[in-house]
Swiss-Prot record:
Similarity comment text for this entry: Belongs to the UPF0276 family.
NCBIfam families membership: PRK05409.1
Disulfide bonds: none
Taxonomic placement: Bacteria, Bacillati, Cyanobacteriota, Cyanophyceae, Acaryochloridales
UniProt xrefs under Pfam families: MbnB_TglH_ChrH
Record's protein name: UPF0276 protein AM1_3026
Transmembrane segments: none
Organism in which the protein naturally occurs: Acaryochloris marina (strain MBIC 11017)
Gene3D superfamilies, A to Z: Divalent-metal-dependent TIM barrel enzymes
InterPro entries assigned to the protein according to its UniProt record, in alphabetical order: MbnB/TglH/ChrH, Xyl_isomerase-like_sf
């Protein structure tokens, strides 16, 4: 089994359409991200993940922790996640700064939080509980919400920066989401990046968006757009060569297309790696 001490370079999101290609051809990709919720039930998906895990470093990324929900933490889900993490030994475990459940009922979306001091403390406590249960720090990912709460007392980046310190967790920085939010809500994305603590950024996501009537939607169904590539390069200038993932979740293309996107990201990463 490949040692799971760290990752570097540009990885690709693991999708079932590409299991056979990866296992047969063993492409030169430095690491892969698996959607943890897809493997909690065991069976054939977990079998494939274990086969791939034997060859590649893996990170686990989920959508169901519901860190911002008023519901109690779902201990059944956390137990399954811990069992998966203990079995796969991922480099990182991550989820979103969001809520996805009400009164025990889950819905198929990631809802944003009010950015207030009280919510900050509440979510920080829940993250701390999750980390204690899992026995590891987690990464939280920033969203691309299309609505904002009127009573926000903090900007998203102020909220995130404070949360990372209070919860003692790390950030999975989704550059596409920052770009989409900046365009839709009218802020300078560099203000966002400049507010984040450099030492807390452990992974970056890149994806494609869709534009409709001058509004951007984070669909993960297109190549990374030029403006996102530019913002990504600016992020690397601030944070250094942070391991980066190409996400593609709808209209999933051939593995070669994803490899080309990852190679483009790695070209930029190489420009910020220390020279021997």
């Amino acid at each position: 089994m490949v040692a799971m001490t760290a990752i570097q370079g540009a990885g690709i999101g693991l999708r079932s359409q590409h299991y056979a290609h990866i296992l047969t051809h063993q492409p030169a990709i430095p690491w892969l991200e698996a959607l943890s919720d897809n493997y909690l039930g065991g069976g054939l998906p977990l079998y494939h993940l274990e086969q791939i895990r034997a060859q590649y470093p893996i990170t686990l990324h989920g959508v169901s922790l519901s860190l911002g929900s008023a519901d109690p933490l779902n201990m059944d889900y956390l137990t399954q996640l811990k069992q998966l993490a203990d079995r796969i030994e991922p480099v990182h475990v991550s989820d979103h700064l969001a809520w996805v459940s009400v009164n025990g009922h889950y819905f198929n979306d990631l809802a944003p939080l009010p950015y207030t001091e009280s919510v900050l403390h509440y979510v920080a406590d829940r993250i701390s509980q999750v980390q204690e249960f899992l026995g590891r720090r987690i990464l939280i990912e920033n969203l691309s919400p299309y609505l904002q709460f009127r009573h926000n007392s903090l900007t998203e980046w102020q909220f995130l920066a404070a949360l990372l310190v209070e919860a003692d967790c790390h950030l999975l920085l989704d550059i596409n989401n920052v770009y989409v939010n900046a365009t839709n809500h009218g802020f300078d994305p560099l203000d966002y990046l400049d507010a984040l603590p450099v030492d807390r950024i452990k992974e970056i996501h890149l994806a494609g968006y869709e534009e409709q009537d001058h509004f951007l939607f984070d669909t993960h169904g297109y190549p990374v757009q030029p403006g996102v590539w530019t913002l990504y390069q600016q992020a690397l200038q601030r944070f250094g060569p942070v391991p980066t993932l190409i996400e593609w979740d709808t209209d999933i293309p051939s593995f070669d297309v994803l490899m080309a996107e990852a190679q483009q990201a790695d070209t930029y990463l190489c420009q910020h790696r220390p020279q021997n």
